[in-house]
């Protein structure tokens, strides 16, 4: 556990992590402060941050399981201690960390007797198992257990439907939220009209990301939600803004596509996903909303095409070109 003495600045707004600990692989805790704030601001920020932490951060879960010769979810399998339902509930609890987009496949193939744990899950490289010791099943006899899995990254909840059983597979209720809990409290200090506030924010996560990472992601998501309001104001000043705005050379993306193909002949561009480019969240979200999922999708767009994307700015195009040049050395 890490603790720091709380110090309050009376001049510059600042935040600090004052306590951080890892209780176990699936429970991390962090306590943060933001100060100094004017009276009322701490509650405004605290409420918004708590809602963003609990509802706006994506997580990764197992959402479907498939195995042969299972008549229904509540059946039992000879040689396995747990029922099918209990195995599905254990799979629901597996904590995963990933940067994938959409769904991916994984599988379990184990032979008894012995315990089947999370370390027996064979997953894509983009998916990391947080706690390999999580229990799935116990095989009492020398039998094989093979289960196909579907892994998905999303936010909030996913509740299985009665008509959602397909091809002998079983949907699993998923809780995508990596933040287990978040609380905020306020400490006031000062006298009279000069009273100020310190916001204390406590975050518990499931280990798929740290409380600090959760705080950063929630903050970015809140900023993204407010960008349309800023964009609307910018449009009213569009003509004045354009007089001072720098521009890029026109339509450079097709040239870069040709050079990238020349420099990286061995790479299939359609198999390079933009998830791998470490894009800023705002740019990444804009591209995803426009169905740009791979490097090939991106490089087939002109600068004019990109500028038509909602909330996409000339500065974003510049930053995107810089990232491409960094990753692929485009001259």
Curated annotation (Swiss-Prot):
InterPro entries tied to this protein: DNA-dir_RNA_pol_insert, DNA-dir_RNA_pol_RpoA/D/Rpb3, DNA-dir_RpoA, RBP11-like, RNAP_asu_C, RNApol_insert_sf
Q: Where in the cell is it found?
A: Plastid, Chloroplast
Kindly list any coiled-coil regions of this protein: none
Q: Where is this region: Alpha C-terminal domain (alpha-CTD)?
A: 265-331
Entry EC number(s): 2.7.7.6
A Gene Ontology biological process annotation? DNA-templated transcription
Locate the region Alpha N-terminal domain (alpha-NTD): 1-233
Q: Which UniProt keywords apply?
A: Chloroplast, DNA-directed RNA polymerase, Nucleotidyltransferase, Plastid, Transcription, Transferase
Q: Name one GO cellular component term.
A: chloroplast
Assign the protein's first listed, main location to one coarse class: plastid
GO molecular function terms listed in the Swiss-Prot or TrEMBL record:
DNA binding; DNA-directed RNA polymerase activity; protein dimerization activity
> Which reaction is catalysed here?
RNA(n) + a ribonucleoside 5'-triphosphate = RNA(n+1) + diphosphate
Origin: domain of life = Eukaryota
Q: Which family does it belong to?
A: Belongs to the RNA polymerase alpha chain family.
Q: What is said about its interaction partners and assembly?
A: In plastids the minimal PEP RNA polymerase catalytic core is composed of four subunits: alpha, beta, beta', and beta''. When a (nuclear-encoded) sigma factor is associated with the core the holoenzyme is formed, which can initiate transcription.
Q: What is this protein called?
A: DNA-directed RNA polymerase subunit alpha
The source organism is: Vitis vinifera (Grape)
- Where is the organism placed in the taxonomic lineage, from the top? Eukaryota, Viridiplantae, Streptophyta, Embryophyta, Tracheophyta
């Amino acid at each position: 556990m890490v603790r720091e003495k709380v110090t309050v600045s009376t001049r510059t707004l600042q935040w600090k992590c004052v306590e951080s600990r890892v209780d176990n692989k699936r429970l991390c805790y962090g306590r943060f402060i933001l100060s100094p704030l004017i009276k009322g601001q701490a509650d405004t920020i605290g409420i918004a941050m708590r809602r963003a932490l609990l509802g706006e951060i994506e997580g990764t879960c197992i959402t479907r399981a498939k195995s042969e010769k299972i008549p229904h979810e509540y059946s039992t399998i000879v040689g396995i201690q747990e029922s099918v339902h209990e195995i599905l509930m254990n799979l629901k609890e597996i904590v995963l960390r990933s940067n994938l987009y959409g769904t991916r496949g994984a599988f379990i193939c184990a032979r008894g007797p012995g315990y089947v744990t999370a370390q027996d899950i064979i997953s894509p490289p983009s998916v990391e198992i947080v706690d390999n010791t999580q229990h799935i099943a116990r095989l009492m006899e020398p039998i094989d257990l093979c289960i196909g899995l579907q892994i998905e990254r999303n936010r909030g909840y996913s509740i299985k439907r009665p008509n959602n059983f397909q091809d002998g597979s079983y949907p699993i209720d998923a809780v995508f939220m990596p933040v287990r809990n978040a609380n905020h409290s306020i400490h006031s200090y000062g006298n009279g009209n000069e009273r100020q506030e310190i916001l204390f924010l406590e975050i518990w996560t499931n280990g798929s990301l740290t409380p600090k990472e959760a705080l950063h992601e929630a903050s970015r998501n809140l900023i993204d939600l407010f960008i349309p309001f800023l964009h609307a104001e910018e449009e009213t000043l569009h003509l004045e803004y354009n007089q001072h705005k720098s521009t890029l050379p026109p339509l450079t993306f097709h040239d870069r596509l040709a050079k990238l193909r020349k420099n990286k002949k061995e790479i299939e561009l359609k198999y390079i996903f933009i998830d791998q480019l470490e894009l800023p969240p705002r740019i990444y979200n804009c591209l995803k909303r426009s169905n740009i999922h791979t490097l090939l999708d991106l490089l087939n767009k002109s600068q004019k095409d990109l500028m038509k994307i909602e909330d996409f700015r000339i500065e974003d195009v510049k930053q995107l070109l810089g990232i491409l040049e960094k990753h692929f050395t485009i001259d």
